[in-house]
């Protein structure tokens, strides 16, 4: 499960923490992972990840949100030991473009190296939208996305060859 916390203009309060605690206890009972995604919410993300140390609680890295909201903060280094999910997509730093990887300005070799060094063993998950790809058929878009995911996986594993 991936949860979006409030942005840092709306600092999470004790009631919010209590509600998350209830969700996390239920998730632990059912062995469900609860991850918190980086948005414009790094203070809230810090609070939640430092409050809940359960093995079922972790971090969902979103590459587009990283570039847009915290480009100077090494989020993978900071939370890599808690990394449980990836939302990978590209942009040029303007807004949440959700482009396919390698169509924007993200330095994918560096990102995937950091992910590899974090010890993350999960899937390489893309989160693109077809806004910039309306000229492609659905099948062409999916084929291209699959090729890009494979390329990211290659970058992730090249570190250990």
Please name every model-derived segment.
Residues 1-58, 68:
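Active-site acidic/histidine proton-transfer and metal-coordination neighborhood
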Residues 42-161:
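Histidine-acidic metal/acid-base catalytic patches
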């Amino acid at each position: 499960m991936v949860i979006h916390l409030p942005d840092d203009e709306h600092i999470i309060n004790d009631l919010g923490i209590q509600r998350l605690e209830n969700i996390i206890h239920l998730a632990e009972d059912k062995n469900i992972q609860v991850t918190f995604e980086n948005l414009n919410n790094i203070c809230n993300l810090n609070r939640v990840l430092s409050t809940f140390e359960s093995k079922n609680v972790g971090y969902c890295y979103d590459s587009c949100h990283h570039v847009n909201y915290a480009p100077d903060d090494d989020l993978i280094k900071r939370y890599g030991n808690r990394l449980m999910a990836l939302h990978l997509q590209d942009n040029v730093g303007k807004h949440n473009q959700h482009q396919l990887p390698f169509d924007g300005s993200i330095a994918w070799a560096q990102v995937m190296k950091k992910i590899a060094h974090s010890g993350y063993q999960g899937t390489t998950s893309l989160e693109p939208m077809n806004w910039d790809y309306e000229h492609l058929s659905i099948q062409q878009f999916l084929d291209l996305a699959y090729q890009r995911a494979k390329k990211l996986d290659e970058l992730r594993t090249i570190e250990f060859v």
